Amino acid sequence: MLATAKMSGVAFAEGVPTPAPVQTPTAADDPAASKFSKLRGVNLGAWLVLEKWMTSDTFGGTEAEDEYTLCQVLGNKAKDRLDEHRDTFITARDFRWIKSSGLNAVRLPVGYWALEAPAPYVECSRYIDFALDQCQKNNLKLVLDLHGAPGSQNGWDHSGRAGAINWPKDPQNIEETLRVLESFAQKYGNHPALCGIELLNEPRQEVPLDILQKFYQDGYTRVRKYLAPDVAVVIHDSFRPLEWKNFMQQPAFNNVILDTHLYQCFDHEAKTRSGLQQLAFALNRRTALDEMKTEELPPMVGEWSLSLPHKAMSGLSSLQMESVTRGYAGAQLLNYEATRGWFFWSYKLEQPSEWHFRHCVERGWLPSDFSV
């Protein structure tokens, strides 16, 4: 999902812009992209890839900070601990609620250990099956997102193992990632609910661009042969949103979506802005989204939340804080509706917060019906 020092990598003007009319992409823009014409969804974060800050109870009784270490510490008890979490954190009731809210999609983060788990990980393939089947039952689409790669593509806990960024340093790590992606495509490529496979979540800027671009091209080749034309291949911008012009163009590459993650709470420059300035910043993101958009690589916003730096709320009354939060939600939705789709991070956490989609809806910060 995120780390405490992430930035969008794009500078935005401070002035309050006049938003351009939103033109929703449709299947007519690209007939092969019909499953990805307008997705409104949530991430099922911390379910099949653990994040301690979201589900600390799962880490109870240990000092582990990531899934790798937790499984290592628990040893032969790891499967029972993780299965209990996986069985209860997301259930059929959650998919029904997601559908009832008017959303039409979920983004499902999984690790490279999902199908075949090297020690100490615990595989979770039956939960992917469950998620896809629940999506089909509730007329939802699913983006399968490879959130953690061998060696770690970003060094953050949500890659499975926090620490060094070793993924790009060993060709075997990259080849294993490609093998896993091909296995995903073989197993799930024909599922009616699948609308996209994301090749890699949030590869950090330290990953050399040439290595990452070759990986994306190779990954496309490995999965596309198993996917219907209307199932997208999704690539993340690596927090370098303007580096993808003229990349993976048609006709060699078809139905590719560029994922960007937009968080103001981790932008160092944004931490000094007032609440009003935060709203102006959010409104101005449309400019950045337009700048990164190309005909070949239309964008989606794969992660966003309502969390803002503490400075934004400093000195505000409760009513003002509520107004800023609602305004921030509206500003983001206004702009993200102009993309192929968006996914809030995350559907739920153990504790209510600006990251907890259901809580945000119940508080009135977000709409209660997204089907309008």
Regions found by a protein language model. Name each.
Residues 52-65, 120-123, 151-169, 253, ...:
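Aromatic- and acidic-residue-enriched segments that line the glycan-binding/catalytic groove
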Residues 179, 186-189, 193-196, 200-333:
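Extracellular glycoside hydrolase catalytic/binding regions
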Residues 318-372:
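Aromatic-rich peripheral "rim/lid" segments of glycoside hydrolase catalytic domains that contact
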Residues 76-88, 164-174, 277-287, 323:
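A short acidic, glycine-rich active-site loop
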Residues 38-44, 106-108, 142-146, 195-197, ...:
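Hydrophobic faces of well-ordered beta-strands that scaffold small-molecule active sites
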Residues 1-15:
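N-terminal export signals
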Residues 15-103:
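N-terminal carbohydrate-binding accessory modules
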Residues 84-106, 116, 120-148, 158-196, ...:
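An active-site-proximal structural segment forming one wall of the substrate-binding cleft
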